[in-house]
């Protein structure tokens, strides 16, 4: 997955994806936010899987 696809999926899943990516800390990402995980070099696909795991109520079509 490319960063662009991650950002597109974030936009589909969250009303304010920029704030979510900046402020929500995920234990699934080693205690990092989405933006921090990207800066640390984590793969976008792994980050997306962490976001999905952190949000079990996410509709199946977005998983």
Predicted regions mapped to residue ranges:
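C-terminal alpha-helical interaction appendages
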Residues: 1-63
């Amino acid at each position: 997955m490319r960063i662009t696809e991650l950002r597109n999926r974030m936009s589909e899943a969250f009303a304010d994806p920029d704030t979510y990516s900046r402020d929500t800390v995920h234990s699934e990402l080693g205690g990092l936010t989405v933006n921090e995980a990207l800066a640390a070099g984590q793969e976008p696909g792994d980050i997306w899987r962490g976001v999905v795991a952190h949000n079990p109520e996410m509709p199946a079509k977005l998983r």
